[in-house]
């Protein structure tokens, strides 16, 4: 029994060291990106909202995108060219879930860090989900908890092709009274 405890303790210590190493690597990469003065956009949203699919479409990447909870377990960053002269770093993040203690789950630590440090948040919403408004509120609560609620946000209403009747939306940009883009409707 004592030998088992010692082995378990050693494995836990080794895993903690690996986690610290990964955390340091991410911090180093983040500093390098920030030193390049390139704006960072983070895709945030409820789990299974289509963040990875949008990330793949925009960056021509091939990150895992499945119709299942937690298909994305780690953050991924790629350069996104907005024009020939302008590019940003786009980060795909782990989806949020209602009532999950985000601060207690180490898999979320990188996502929470990337989100809080982003210059712009692209809040991806699955408009086909019956509780999408509640999911938006859940994401907003997490953003407030981690101090990212003041980061400028653009709502990306996704999966509009699944809507019908009065809920149907056309793809395009939604603007406020001053003409500023506040949301976009897409299907990926």
Residues covered by each model-derived region:
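Conserved catalytic network of the ASCE P-loop NTPase/AAA+ motor domain
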Residues: 80-84, 89, 113-117, 128-131, ...
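Conserved ATPase-coupling elements of RecA-like P-loop NTPase cores
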Residues: 100-103, 131-136, 164-170
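P-loop/Walker A phosphate-binding loop and immediately adjacent motor/lid segment at beta-alpha junctions
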Residues: 134-156, 160
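Conserved nucleotide-binding/hydrolysis micro-motifs of P-loop NTPases
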Residues: 94-97, 127-131, 159-164, 188
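Inter-motif core of Ras-like GTPase G domains
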Residues: 103-129, 140-148, 187
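Conserved G1/Walker A P-loop phosphate-binding module
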Residues: 1-121
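Canonical P-loop GTPase G-domain recognition
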Residues: 149-154, 160-188
């Amino acid at each position: 029994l004592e030998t088992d405890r010692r082995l378990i303790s050693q494995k836990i210590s080794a895993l903690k060291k690996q986690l610290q190493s990964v955390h340091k690597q991410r911090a180093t990469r983040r500093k390098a990106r920030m030193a390049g003065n390139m704006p960072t956009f983070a895709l945030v949203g409820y789990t299974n909202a289509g963040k990875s699919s949008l990330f793949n479409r925009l960056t021509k990447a091939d990150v895992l995108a499945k119709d299942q909870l937690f298909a994305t377990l780690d953050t991924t960053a790629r350069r996104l060219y907005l024009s020939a002269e302008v590019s940003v770093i786009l980060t795909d993040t782990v989806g949020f879930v209602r009532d999950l203690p985000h601060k207690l789950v180490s898999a979320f630590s990188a996502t929470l860090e990337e989100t809080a440090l982003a210059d712009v948040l692209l809040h991806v919403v699955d408009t086909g989900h019956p509780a999408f408004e509640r999911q938006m509120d859940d994401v907003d609560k997490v953003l407030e908890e981690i101090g990212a609620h003041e980061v400028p946000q653009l709502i990306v209403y996704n999966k509009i092709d699944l809507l019908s009747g009065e809920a149907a939306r056309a793809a395009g940009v939604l603007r406020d009274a001053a003409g500023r883009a506040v949301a976009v409707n897409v299907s990926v």
